[in-house]
Swiss-Prot record:
Entry keyword annotation includes Transmembrane helix: yes
Lineage: Bacteria, Bacillati, Cyanobacteriota, Cyanophyceae, Synechococcales
GO cellular component: photosystem II reaction center; plasma membrane-derived thylakoid membrane
Segments for region (Disordered): 1-25
Key words of the record: Membrane, Photosynthesis, Photosystem II, Reaction center, Thylakoid, Transmembrane, Transmembrane helix
Name of the coding gene: psbJ
Biological-process GO terms, alphabetical: photosynthesis
Organism, as annotated: Synechococcus sp. (strain CC9605)
The protein, known as: Photosystem II reaction center protein J
Length: 66
């Protein structure tokens, strides 16, 4: 993570510098810190769809199909 001292009591680092430029470079946003929530939700949603699809596939083939 960043070695900057946070001015906020809860430890947040400002998103922008005083001149308006991003405080953290774009590339660092993907390699440091927490994963973006949309990325976690997308991966989780795809996993849920896969498992549900596997159950539907299993209901039409194999032991429970006849």
């Amino acid at each position: 993570m960043s070695g900057k001292k946070s001015p906020y009591p809860d430890g947040r680092i400002p998103d922008r510098n005083p001149d308006g430029t991003p405080a953290v470079p774009w590339r660092s946003r993907w390699t440091e810190g927490v994963l973006p929530l949309w990325l976690v939700a997308t991966a989780g949603g795809m996993a849920v769809l896969f498992v549900v699809g596997l159950f539907f596939y299993g209901s039409y083939t194999g032991v429970g199909s006849a």
